[in-house]
Each structure stands twice: as C-alpha cells, then as structure tokens.
Amino acid sequence: GVGYPQQNLSHFRSTDIWASTADTYEEPTGWWGRYFEDLYPDYLINPPEIPPAVQIGNVGNLIFDGNNNNYAFTVANLEQLQNVAENGTLHDVVNIPDCVYGDKLLFMRATANTTFLYAETIHDAYTAASNNADYGEGDLGQQLSAVARLIKGGLGTKVYMVSLGSFDTHANQPERHQELLQDLSNSIKAFYEDLAVSGMDDKVLGMTISEFGRRPYENGSDGTDHGAASPVMLFGAGLNGSGFVGEHPDINEWDANDNLIPTNDFRDVYNSVLTNWFCLDPSVINTILLNQSYEILDLGIECQTLSTNDFSNVNRFSHVPVYKNNTVYLEMNVPSAGRGTIVLYDLVGREIGTIANQLFFEGRHSIDIKEAIGKRLSFGQYIYRISLGGQHYSKSLMIK
C-alpha cells in the first residue's frame, strides 16, 4: 500500500501532492519539473535539441512544471503535430514587463515556444518508426503505441506520461475495475512486445501512479469511495524478476477516517527509481525531492552509471557553484587545456556579463563570480553558461 501521512481525499489536491511531492504545503513545481530545471537552467535561451519530456493528455498535472517553465511537450494527440510545425511562430521571452502579468505571459510564451520548437522533431521521430504489436482500440493502447514509435524512432526523450481514467469507481466497481485492469494489462503487454522487436524492452521502465486508493469496504452503490494506500505497479524487462515489494496493508486495520494505512511512502518509490534507474547524483535527487530523505526500495533495478559531478575523476569535465562566506565560486575540473568562455544570464535570458574568456589549463579552477563580473549583482537566481571544447554546460546559481 503506497501513500503518505494524512491522505488528502480531494482529486485535485492529492494529484498535486503526488506531482509535487509536498504534502504539508502547496508547492507550485513538480518533481520532474525541478529535475529538468536543474538540468536545463538556461532552458529559455538554450533549449535542448529534444523535448525533456512528452505528455499525452492530462494537461493540468504540474508534474513537469518548474518555477518558470513547463518542461513537457504536451499534446492531446499526435495528429496535431504537423499543423503545429507548419503554422507555429516563436514568441519573445526577453521583453517582458516586470509584474504579475509579465510572469504569466512569460510562462505562456515559453510553453508555446517549446511546443513549436519540438513539433518537427517529434513528427520526424514518429514517422521514422512503426508499430509491431496489436494495441487494440483503447485510448491507453493508442497512447502507448505513439510512445513506442517515438522511442523506436530515436527521439531520445527519457520521460513520457500517458493516462488512463475512470478509476473513480463509486459505483459498479466489480465490472468497471476488471475492464480497466484488462485494458491496462493488454496495453502494457502490447507496448513491451513492440519495444522487444527493436531490442528496447529492457531499456524502458513503466510505472503507474494515482492520486489515491479506495476505501476497504463497499459504499452501498456497488463501489468504493476515495481512500488511501494505493498500489503502484512497475513494468519492464529491465526489472530483476517480479513480485510484491513491501508489506500489504492490514485489511482489518483502518485509520480514524476508515482508510487503510499505507506501508510505503510514494516518495520512497520515486527515490528508488531516480537512484537505481535514472542513476542521478544524490545532490540532484535531494533537489527533486525538496531536500527530504526517503528510503530506497528493492525494486529489482540497480544503477551502473557513475555520477556526472564526480570531482575525483580528473578525466571528466565537472562544474558546480560553491558558496563560501557570502561569496559564490564556480569550481571546474578541466581534463584538457582549451580556450573557453563563461557568461552569466538572468532567468529570462538577458546577458549580465562575461565571467571568463580565457585559456583554461588542465586541472581545477575556482572563479569568484562577483569579482569576475566586476559590477553589482542583485540578489537572486542566475544562470551561467560554459562554452569549452565545442561543448556547452549550464547551471543555475544564487547571488546572496
């Protein structure tokens, strides 16, 4: 049984809790949004070549929301893509008024730009592949068939979100629940059969999430009402075996609101997937999970990838802002000498100044940001962009 303490039974609030990971206050960003915000701090001025995430339907979910951007390419159906690619125009995100209206305008323009930017890329990947499995006519199956084509077509996006509704079974649950689980089973089976044809079934992990579970008793209408302790299911050939993880909630032990008592926190599941499937650095996971500590569950996955910010490896380029005594330093590990530039931007992409334009010798470098810029910087968040050896690297930092 997966959930969180004092389960909220509102569809909207609990959906936000599962998307944001914050259950004691209203957090405006999602857990994947925070990851992509950390990964692409200069998203508005230097977006990646492929969409960070693809979301089909369920557009109100904040799971991919950052502070200033939504990082998912979101569509109702893939047939819309060609029209967007042919008719889209880009919007200015620099000359924005400094007010509440400007904040909203920036968000809308950035989201629209992302859609137009990636439409052709997604269309090309979609048309480069075909399906090799029978998905049936169900909505979930059709969504997964599109995802399979994007993966097989070489899009390169790592996170996809699809949806299956109608689990709010206040009435006629036995028949409806069986139909839904059969749809889920058939769709997942077809999806992995399709991926297996291209040898990709062990490289894709599927996971279900829902805002809550159901009560442990019938409600008088042949259904059940909103409850706690929902199941989370994982799928994929990359899982080491299959089975039940954790303890099943005691069917005879309820909380004060007549709910089953969860035995696993949903953020433990997130932490486990981020650690052992996506192989993220612990400091990044800490940001994603709002600086809270959670357990790692034995889900049958194990990471084999090294951290991307390992300063002990002298053969890898690394960079990180370090805060000491009210001063911000940019520390870099340069594996081979080369000329490079480092430029500082504000959050809407305006260039603030050049931090460095020089030959960087092999080894460790530490640069005082304020001293290098040579002018007063207002308190707040900024983005630095390193150009070195034909590559570009970015990260956000705080001026305090």
Report the location of each language-model feature:
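Non-cytosolic beta-sheet module surface loops
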Residues: 331-336, 346, 386-388
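C-terminal tail/sorting-segment detector
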Residues: 354, 359-362, 370, 375-400
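Feature for exported/extracytoplasmic and membrane-associated proteins, marking the mature portion
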Residues: 1-187, 193-197, 217, 231-238, ...
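Metal-dependent active-site segment of extracytoplasmic phospho-/sulfohydrolases and closely related
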Residues: 188, 194-220
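Short beta-strand/loop motifs in extracellular/secreted proteins, especially
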Residues: 338-341
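Short, glycine-anchored, charge-dense loop/turn motifs used at functional sites
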Residues: 345-352, 382
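Residue-level detector of functionally pivotal "anchor" positions at catalytic/ligand-binding pockets or at interdomain
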Residues: 301-325, 333-335
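Phosphate-handling catalytic cores of nucleic-acid transaction enzymes
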Residues: 227
